[in-house]
Amino acid sequence: MLMTTPGSPLPSPDVLLEAANRAARAIPPLWPLASSVAVNPFLGQTGEPLATAASRLRRVAGIPLTMPRSWYADRLRSGEIAEEDLRAAFESAPAALRPKTFASLKRAVQSERPEPHAIPTLADLARDVAGIDWPAIVNDRISHWASSYFDEGQALWAKGQQGAAYSAWRIIATHDLTPEIAGLEGFAQSVADAPANAEDAIIACVARLGLCGPALESYFHRLLTTLGGWSQLARYRLWQAELTGNTDASVTDLLTIRLIWEAALLRKFGPVVEAQWKAAIAAYAEPVSATPEDVVDAILQEAAERAAQWRLGACLTGTSPARVADGRPTLQMAFCIDVRSEVFRRALESLDPGIRTLGFAGFFGLGIGHRRFGSDVVEARLPVLLKPGIFTCSGEATPAVTSSDLAARITARVERAWGRFKLAAISSFAFVEAAGPIYVAKLLRDGLGLKRHAAPNDPAPRPTSALDLDTRLTMAVSILKAMSLTRGFARLVLLAGHGANVVNNPHASALHCGACGGYSGEVNARLLASVLNDREVRADLAERGIIVPEDTLFLAALHDTTTDDVNIYAADHASAAHAEDVDQAERWLKSAGILARGERALRLPRAKQGQDIPHRARDWAELRPEWALAGCQAFIAAPRARTAGHDLAGRAFLHDYDWRRDDGFGVLELILTAPVVVASWISLQYYGSTVAPDVFGAGNKLLHNVTGGIGVVEGNGGLLRAGLPWQSVHDGERLTHEPLRLSVLIEAPREAIARILERHPEVRALFDNLWLHLFALDDKGRMAWRYTGDLQWETCVGDEHADEHSVREVA
């Protein structure tokens, strides 16, 4: 059946393909499990405010973007959200869209919003009239093919991976009789008759479906969301291709495949769904605009965030118990800004007044592509927004290291061959019968969590091509300035990357360092330590005004965020003169780990005391070995003195920054355009996985199966799941992550911040549309000014509401 009527103009190919491109870019990318990183699920909607994005995603995904109103009502009743917070959020909302009076807003809080429903696809309409779950059938057949096509080494017999996605799918679909058995006669033939070129196929399907120009983008977006993580994985391929100046058509190929299914269903069910389909097209063609209900929800969300901001401000201005000794520090230790470091840093500093800690992006400013010992795989250990500029490998280029590298490669090949033998279709049966008893001891050891996993300890990294002195010097100067570490060096300076230590966890890489692209951060830290210990670099640093004392030694370390153990790579730069310093540092780190584990045990289910935590890392059945970044609420770029000693409960990204040392505000620009953006991706992934877990969450860990080595499905099939598992945001009884958009606090002149936002419209959009909140701190560390959008600021509320807020618990 052809839905086009003589009076309905067919969109031009350019209009049609541009709509397909916009829909593709509205989908967030999904990184494979080997290097999974947090991704902002609203990446395609940051150019519009929350209320408008809620309207858009309700149409295309049938999801809310805020919590149920009862969640806000409970907090209003308890005083956690004060009436003043609600009033301030109400007054900041656009007058034309908000409720007419504050009283009407308060009444709206007591009534639950309507259940969100997506505009139907033809598969939805066919299900309703035929009683057959066509959306499930479509998703099942596409997933069955996609899990093989996108496979990255898990399948022993991968098939159909040659060529573009659309072409590969046509080869499989023309021989798949499942749709015809389900009742869609002639489907295989219709696929064979479809144009061989994906763009031509899109044009043909749009004509058959009778779509008008205004409906295209929303309809295309809707179809891509029905494919779950598969469309996000395809979007990742486009993202990666564009980093190197190329392109990839996988996501539009998936759209083409989904359109062919829609056209086939129209051919079958057109006469009985014609009226409903025309109504759906009209709904897709409607402009996206926020409804009054969307605006109410956005106001409630902002009120909750204002309440959290007040608690944060009260914490920062409270009396700090921190003791800071005058003179040269006894120990300096730089950590990643990751919120998990906040607990450990506070514990470490409490042990001695001479200990100073710093916060900096965990890749330490080194965008490297690293090849591990005995491997040819290049790991991009840097933020996913960037591409590697330096390539490194493990071990010096000596005969002994080369021989060890070769031996490691041979061992790895033998292990891979043995693994494939164990899993092969025929030999697997004989293997279990013959060799099963040999594995009893290993099974018991691993099952009981008796095996301990050592920290990564490859030979020290080195650039594959030697870096000249100017390059090394430039790196050292820029990184030390970015860390605000240009004077007052201790005898021992530790550079601590971080990683996780878990077993039986497909999402293990998501617990590693996001700034290192989902890998642990020790490689970057070890490389930076070697640069900063270089005598030639030290000499030239002095000429640049950065005087590093002769007796200062930089060493790398790795903070295990699961167990709070810290491993120092002292052998990289062995120094007899610093042996006692290293020993003392190890004692302090051990004590800090005990304190940090004790604090973390209070939040972890079934962890009664700190010593329970290390076993959780080795427990096959443990769903929550750590909370990762759950609870993240703030990003603070300021001198450590502003936050030292204040209990931020592991909820804040802490980046050391002193604007007085930042000539030209280049470091400030770097912070706003890199770490802040990465932190926003993390915060919004947790937000999306909490408020809309069905679409932006990975589902139930108990049901996860890895497919293709790239992602997880629930059970034995279905759509690829993206985002965070439910157990990462919920403890089984209540949410452990409070869904709040990140508050960014920066101690710097407002004019400098505004100039940077003006130069970076994509970053500015995050603040203008309130995907992030922005505050400027004054010289006393107070949240003095709030960014209100359009490069404007307002003075924050002072003490006039202190009585009302005093009823609330200060974090």
UniProtKB/Swiss-Prot annotation:
Residues engaged in binding Zn(2+): 336, 338, 498, 513
Subcellular location, record wording: Cell inner membrane
Domain of life: Bacteria
One cellular component term from this protein's GO annotations in UniProt: plasma membrane
Membrane topology: Peripheral membrane protein
Keywords: Cell inner membrane, Cell membrane, Membrane, Metal-binding, Transport, Zinc
Cofactor(s), names only, from the UniProt record: Zn(2+)
Keyword Cell membrane: yes
Keyword hit for Metal-binding: yes
MF term (GO), any: zinc ion binding
Subcellular location, principal: membrane
PANTHER family according to UniProt: INORGANIC CARBON TRANSPORTER SUBUNIT DABA-RELATED, UPF0753 PROTEIN AQ_863
Role noted for this protein: Part of an energy-coupled inorganic carbon pump.
Subunit structure: Forms a complex with DabB.
Name this protein carries in UniProt: Probable inorganic carbon transporter subunit DabA
Species of the source: Azorhizobium caulinodans (strain ATCC 43989 / DSM 5975 / JCM 20966 / LMG 6465 / NBRC 14845 / NCIMB 13405 / ORS 571)
